[in-house]
């Protein structure tokens, strides 16, 4: 049904027309000629550019808009479409994946967390080598614990903002879980000592940065006065928590998603993020996207 189209159109209307669509007042000093021009544009569906300056009310600066999505492919499509419609102004919208946004923020503030702002981001192969090293250091039998199972458990813990201590408390005497807890703790220590983060840490440390340094969170909340999220059914607890941190004061947030398309639960996606959205944001309005933008039929 074109969820990305809905996000793009929303941003374009905010930048071009501000709150003209919700403002009940006719613009001041509107001439009869202008009213006639607006009526013609309305009747014909053409001439939007001619009436833009007449009906615009409190345009939104593109640099005050944050648009976040789930995959690099979706983020690139979003950027491309905004550039096509808005031109150079489209470049000023912060459009990126959650991880790219977090990396960008941490590059400026990681020193508040004990890292340097030039920290290294480990890829999957780097993480695999480090986890294997931790197993060896702890003299654990790698035949009993596969790399995939260890990586999965650590990643899910981070998706849920569960640190090493909390994870250890939840092992309940289970040998396998206790062994993973040991690896998790040593893995994080070695990452920190190497001034490195893995992909999941980008979310965790951004959340921690905003939690422990509210003045930084406030800075970005004031910059991103309008937050939009695409494919929201695919977000995990950590991603959703960061959105809450940025929007809890101004409450200007718009997300699109389809609860029937949630396919990433194995990666930590939490469908409740969209199902319970109206409970978290009182007064939120729900719109059903029933127009198919992909088909010519």
Give the residues covered by each predicted segment.
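Active-site catalytic microenvironments for nucleophilic, acid-base chemistry
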Residues: 13-21, 81-85, 108-109, 134-137, ...
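Phosphate/oxyanion-binding loops and surfaces in catalytic or ligand/nucleic-acid-binding neighborhoods
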Residues: 85, 108, 112, 137-141, ...
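P-loop NTPase Walker
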Residues: 1-117, 121, 218, 272, ...
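Conserved helicase NTPase motor core
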Residues: 1, 6, 26-33, 61, ...
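Switch/connector loops and helix/strand junctions flanking conserved nucleotide-binding motifs
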Residues: 74-79, 102-105, 162-163, 262-265, ...
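Coupling/switch/interface segments within P-loop NTPase motor domains and analogous charged loops
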Residues: 124-191
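Short acidic/histidine-centered micro-motifs embedded in hydrophobic/aromatic stretches
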Residues: 101, 150-153, 157, 170, ...
